[in-house]
């Protein structure tokens, strides 16, 4: 009976910690443009999905492509998108919809440098809905980074700026 009480106390403490971390995550992690992009590509059907870096974000316009080709598209390019990020975004898209084409804009600079840890490290992963791609992305990329990045994804954001936004998060 004594061991049972210890187990129950441990479960309660873990549940409280998980709830607290989830609440802090919801309150302090800023809403990013990536959230909108990931939501768009998993919720809507597009003929073409464009992945890549900041060059693709500024230089490839899906609306112009649609005018010329008649095919719908969405641009998920963003600065700091490494090959591994694009791969798992493509995997997520393939799980959720079946685009006719995935266009990948390549910046060779991202293949000769290591992905830096920091608040940009979770930019993509944090916005993925629960899926097989998210679990694989975690084990192949995110699990190798600093544990604070996984448990406290908001730790690198300026709290002075974000605290003023907390009220807006819940209204």
Predicted regions and their residues:
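N-terminal hydrophobic targeting signals that begin at the initiator methionine
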Residues: 1-3
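Proline-aspartate-enriched helix->loop->beta-strand connector
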Residues: 98-100
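Short beta-strand segments
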Residues: 104-105
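Hydrophobic membrane-insertion alpha-helices, especially the h-region
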Residues: 5-27
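Secreted/periplasmic serine-hydrolase-like ester/acetyl group-modifying domain
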Residues: 119-171
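Phosphate-binding glycine-rich loops and adjacent basic patches that engage nucleotide phosphates
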Residues: 21-29, 45-55, 160-171
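Serine-esterase "nucleophile elbow" of acetyl-processing enzymes
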Residues: 28-81, 87, 92-95
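Extracytoplasmic/secreted cell-surface and envelope-processing proteins
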Residues: 58, 83-86, 110-119
